[in-house]
Curated annotation (Swiss-Prot):
Organism: Drosophila melanogaster (Fruit fly)
Swiss-Prot/TrEMBL cofactor(s): Cu cation; Zn(2+)
Tissue specificity comment: Expressed at higher levels in females compared to males.
One example GO MF annotation: copper ion binding
Record localization: Secreted
EC assignment: 1.15.1.1
Function statement: Protects the extracellular space from the toxic effects of reactive oxygen intermediates by converting superoxide radicals into hydrogen peroxide and oxygen.
Full protein name: Extracellular superoxide dismutase [Cu-Zn]
One GO term of the biological process aspect: removal of superoxide radicals
Amino acid sequence: MMQYLVVSLALCATICSAAQTRNMPIQAIAYLIGPVQSDNTQVKGNVTFTQNDCGQNVHVRVQLEGLKEGKHGFHIHEKGDLTNGCISMGAHYNPDKVDHGGPDHEVRHVGDLGNLEANSTGIIDVTYTDQVITLTGKLGIIGRGVVVHELEDDLGLGNHTDSKKTGNAGGRIACGVIGIK
């Protein structure tokens, strides 16, 4: 297990060094897809992550379709495993073992990216910046899973027992693995 960690860290350092040498941003992408629903809709699309320099903020572009109108929890999960669908991705990426929170909260999982809001036609096309995630290094997200949830994330502020663990965001309706672009 330790060998895999060392190899992963070395790979991330190499990617970061190569990108800086060429003065290019590091990019990663995840193609998300969910099961076909009873109304014949299917959540699908992609999430692109761009980091201009190692250690700087990550720009996130989300383009999805097939959602129900409203807010949906959006998280990085600890594993990039699709063996048993989205459930194989494990819990939210939380290396610091802290409570769930919102993207602008001081205390949050690394993977807590808040909510995405689908319009009346079920489309999300949004770009924003996250100050906690990184593509490389100790907290790098490359190779991890990204998940869109059925319900709105309560950002750890709700009274439900799942609030401090998952934001009570409900089931996983689409997921993908983050890979280097």
